[in-house]
Amino acid sequence: MEITDLAAEGNALCRIDDMVMFVPFAAPGDRCTVQVVKKKRNFMQGRIVSIESPSPIRKGPFCTHFTVCGGCKWQHIPYEIQLRAKEQQVTDALVRLGKVEVEEMQPILGSEQTEYYRNKLEFTFSNKRWLLPEEVQEVDGDFSPEVRYGLGFHIPGMFDKVLDIRECHLGAKVSDEIRLFIREYCMQDPERYPFFDLRNQEGLMRTLMIRTTSTGELMVVVVFFRDDVAAREALLAAVAERFPQITSLLYVINTKCNDTIGDQEVLLYHGREYIEEEMEGLKFKIGAKSFYQTNSRQAYQLYRIAREFAGLTGDELVYDLYTGTGTIANFVAGQAHRVIGIEYVPEAIEDARTNSLLNGIENTLFYAGDMKDILTNDFIEQHGRPDVVITDPPRAGMHESVIDAILFAAPRRIVYVSCNPATQARDLALLMADGRYRAVKSRPVDMFPHTHHVENVVLLVRNTE
């Protein structure tokens, strides 16, 4: 089969008898033997058995875990072609499928840094690591920790299988060093530090989170399933001694069935309880539970574009919807009269207020609650109709009542930041349905090189302007 194009979810595609087949890890121009692994009414899913003639654009992957990890599906695609594919993805979602008329489709803003760009990585300990095909027979029947223990990423679609990661080109290089040190330290005494059994909910070592900032600060969070004080203290002391540059060394005792720590107490072992990121002279406190865009450099570019689209002069009332920890709200506050941020997570709103105080920003207000319950007509009448609305919703997009509230508020400009162009197109169509708004420009931003994910910013302007 000849692979003809890149497609959704990081797949490539070919056609068999007018039916589309999605094939992961293929490149346009590849001629390959493909096995059908799933057949639906309108499409098929396949996998490469062998590549008979590689595409001239195909390049060698930079990571030994490529095709198994699932994290960077486009390592074999040159970056400039990745960018073109993401541009096309946005155009298809908005214009071809969403029927949204956009006056100016601006070119994608690529990332200067295409490796080691993530500021946050989370790893899972497992006593049943994923065995590669060449390992299966070699270790058959050997269930020793040396063979079966792993610390790394979940295999896609398999919650209880973890790929033992020896190198990762996403996070800062120090993340590799810390992860490998902790792994080897625990492996010296596996009875004292048993890796977690995800299916049977047993073990001690559960997850590991490492966060970094562009200013060089470093946070390490070790999550244990139970509290073995002596084992915990010995491990954390060893980590602190080996990596004195750690700004914040934290731990969590999580006895729940799931790995989320949002409802768990985060305890300080050494250093500060937070790290600080900096953006255009502003400081942002980041705790273990705080949300912050995982590509710091591109986050600045994304927010800069959003602020530029907002066209602020200093007199505007701005609503920042889905404000998170108030990064956008605080970022634009210096060019607005007042900014009101709304967010579902109460802890995030506390972070937003803290960040305003940290930077001496006095013209922000933050409210916590479900967006559709907070952003009502009464709220708008009480706080004033915004001149500009900036919205950055989750992948699912905005609730229809939120769209209705925005239309009631009738701002002069709406800046829509999205990590999902498909739901963005749906919401834009609703905002533009009665002709009150027109889509003036759209600009994609690549936050995640070597993946299919893309952010997009769209400016809507009220037609009376």
From Swiss-Prot:
Keyword NADP attributed: no
Any one biological process term the GO annotation gives: rRNA base methylation
GO molecular function: 4 iron, 4 sulfur cluster binding; metal ion binding; rRNA (uridine-C5-)-methyltransferase activity
UniProt EC number: 2.1.1.-
Enzyme class: transferase
Ranges for domain TRAM: 1-50
A Pfam family it matches: TRAM
Family: Belongs to the class I-like SAM-binding methyltransferase superfamily. RNA M5U methyltransferase family.
Record InterPro entries: MeTrfase_TrmA_AS (IPR030390), MeTrfase_TrmA_CS (IPR030391), NA-bd_OB-fold (IPR012340), SAM-dependent_MTases_sf (IPR029063), TRAM_dom (IPR002792), U5_MeTrfase_fam (IPR010280)
PROSITE patterns associated with the record: SAM_MT_RNA_M5U, TRAM, TRMA_1, TRMA_2
Highest rank taxon of the organism: Bacteria
UniProt keyword list: 4Fe-4S, Iron, Iron-sulfur, Metal-binding, Methyltransferase, S-adenosyl-L-methionine, Transferase
Catalytic site positions: 419
Binding-site list for S-adenosyl-L-methionine: 293, 322, 343, 392
Gene3D superfamilies referenced in this protein's UniProt entry, alphabetically: 2.40.50.1070, Nucleic acid-binding proteins, Vaccinia Virus protein VP39
Binding site for [4Fe-4S] cluster: 63, 69, 72, 168
Protein name per its UniProtKB record: Uncharacterized RNA methyltransferase PG_1095
S-S bonds: none
